[in-house]
């Protein structure tokens, strides 16, 4: 939900969130959608994960897709949140917070469809920067870590 919240604060006009209605995440997403509508000018719309018509419609009008689930991460690298790769279009940037594997099925299929893609490695790096500082009180040598980690 942090990604949605920050996107709304940064000026996103509309955010489609797909979740399972039986998950505890659903209630948090519904509460955030309500809160965001009062705090920002962003319209946050909550959809059931299995609503393929809503997914198709949302992707057609979107320029950014972010997978903020663990779907596609080791050990289940065959999983994807977009089972129909014809839904990708070159104007859609696709980001996946998954960092292992570096290119998930979602990112591979999006790239093959001409979409710009980003994996979760930079998010992981910057979470590490913050954790390093909390635990040690020191600044992590980001350039050294980036050089070794991003080879």
Where are these regions (language model features)?
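NAD(P)-binding Rossmann-fold cofactor-contacting core
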Residues: 12-40
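Short, basic, helix/turn surface patches
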Residues: 41-51, 142-151
